[in-house]
Amino acid sequence: MNKDMLLLGIGGAGTIMTRGVLRAFGSPINAHAADTDAASGAPGDIPFTLIGGSRLAGRGSGGQPAAARAAFDDDPAVLDPAFDGIRTCVVLTALGGGTGGGATSGILKRLHAHGISTLLFATLPFSFEGHDRERSAKAEAAPLAREADVSVFLPLDELVSEAGTDNMSDALRQAHDTVASGVTLLWRLLKKPGYIRLDPERLHAAIIGAGRARFAAAAATGENRVEEALAKLAASPLLARTSGSAPVRTILVGILAGDDLRLSEVATVASGLSAAFGPDAKLELGTVNDEQTFSGRLALVVLLFEESPAVATRPARSGERALASQSRFGDTSKTTWEGEDLDVPTYLRRNLTLER
């Protein structure tokens, strides 16, 4: 098992989603989970680190981000053994209170101190959970958007809208499964590449300092499977541009199919995504040819990297202080326009709901 990439689940929901990826992938993944609640690691099916054991005694943070933050700050090196040899870390977490909201920022900083690039997927609470949870999630999202190389924020309201059920437990499970299935496709693309290779090193280079992104996946079968999968992506609110979105700078797409994948299908995907989401955007494309998993089926996984109006100042990674991006942007001051701080994402500044 190649260990240059790490899948890291933070908090209870992050751990659940990480387990979902492990189940869907079907073969060993370099994964780890961390939580203030010892019960999250009780199944013993995934390497687990307890955060703040001396402070919280494994009882969890009680939904208090400040408690989780303090617990991680007590011992910020607690996860360091899991970071050894890692180049890129995919982080799964949930915002709106608790360990995910409180500890993720500190963990991202620690990852960057180790020279590790980070791709963050964070769910946002249901709207019915109230203004306190919503305000907490927004306050937590701002530093995460600065600390992560790429941040993808996924509102549970919108994930559930694709689940097609009104049952509470089923909807939440399917929302987590939606995130897990998309991340699984991304992982499979990077770890089991086909004729057009999109390997972890290309992802590492693509995400460094990239900023915000949109993310979705779709699958279809039959004679018109490419057109159907593209139509699903075009209709997905996860990829829709809103008033809080910036133009797309880079389209990263994976095409996963069996041995029947055709060159014409690859060309249709490339042209269709460019036309729909960014005709001037750079296209990074990779394929997976896996007859056992995708026989007769075609799946697409897409990351849309948005243009960044400003680059937040962040300590340089170990060994990367000479990068041109650091020297160009390291000393920039706050960008303001009519009293608004443009370094803060628009959806946070203007209290907008993230839409897919």
Regions of interest found by a model, annotated:
Residues 1-356:
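Tubulin/FtsZ superfamily GTPase core signature
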